[in-house]
């Protein structure tokens, strides 16, 4: 499948220390496994090292890579309280899209 036709996901990982990490991927299960991998191969995010256990707090499809990047950026601009508020409302896709378009 070509890069442009893949289905992209936005995901939030809850770390063992309670922090939240936001990312995008085409395969959430694979990406979580990469983040959890502690054998030093370097495929997980450096910011997650030492923050085990890692669990998926949220994930949803967002369509294109471009849309995923915009939504990821919008979520990363929120503080922890904002991310928690989004999670408590179950982060509906319309909310995410409006967040990503608010900077345009």
Question: Where are the regions that the model predicts?
Answer:
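GIY-YIG nuclease catalytic motif and its immediate N-terminal context
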Residues: 1-41, 49-59, 66-76, 90-104
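Conserved C-terminal helical docking segment of ANL/AMP-forming enzymes
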Residues: 45
